Amino acid sequence: MSDLSRLALEHQRKRTELSERVARRAARLWRSVQASDIDASWDRIAPALGQVVSAGQLQAARMAAGYTSAAARAQGVAGPGQIIPEAFTGATLEGREIVPELFAAATTTKRLIGRGVGVGSAFQAGTALMSILAATTVRDSGNMADKVSGLRRGRTVQYARMVSPGACSRCAILAGVGHFTKHFERHPECRCTTVPIYSDNPNAPLPEGLYGSPADYFESLSKAEQDRIYTKAGAEAIRMGADPVSVVNARRGMFRVQQPGRLVARATPRTLVAPDGRTFQAYVTTENRMRFGSQYRVDGSRRSSSVRLMPETIISMSEGDPVRAVELLRQFGYVP
């Protein structure tokens, strides 16, 4: 395994440990909710939940500059990778505010109780969902910060997926390398991260431990691991020449997360105007102007007239120019 791959795996391990700590803290807060009045209990813990997850996002974002700087040095590339970590807090990947998203744990619990599921089992389901959402939100912020930090070197950059050890088939079929404008796809509980690759030759061989395609990743696995990840029948089909993506997608789709606890193709965008006057479709978030309270029981969110763009949308506006991408990220407050 290359030094770059080892560096990326260590970064991934630390990011995973952080997200799991945040998930445990969020779950502890959730367990204080009283079954006799879930909504009132939620209103009491909501501020603390928001603080716990936002603090985790901040820690995750602060890890980015050191990681991407080390990854760049390993490839003989210099340049600043500073970001504004605070800009990566307070919102989910899709641009929704954190606490209303976490309220899915409460709605899920209430729905199960209403269907006759025992209170204990219903709360266990709510705890599991709370843990998933909290951890995913932290990992997403870290991945966005990694991507933004990796751009700040005035070089053409691609991002290789560092597939998490023990990954599932949905992650395995996303192994590969893509242009920096490509969205980072993932599912709930995905632990994969990215590695910035600096090369003027997009066809240059990747360092050992990184894979250019789902097929390359499949070939790197032992037969036992192939069977575990893709199922015995699926793995045998791939060994006989079937496309790994087709085999996995025949069983289940791969989508980005939109609403808590379910998978959808893409969040609904809004039309916004950039500082240079161009209009575009964007995934946005409000600027923390909601109040904790009954709105969570109505529709799970509260929108304001103020919005800010998420990094992936801003990067997509750059038309493939990394210098332009950094300029836009600076305009929107993600880099100094």
Stretches with model-predicted labels:
Residues 192:
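Glycine-rich, flexible loop motifs
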Residues 1-186, 197-336:
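Domain-core detector
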Residues 189:
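Acidic/histidine-rich catalytic cores and adjacent linkers
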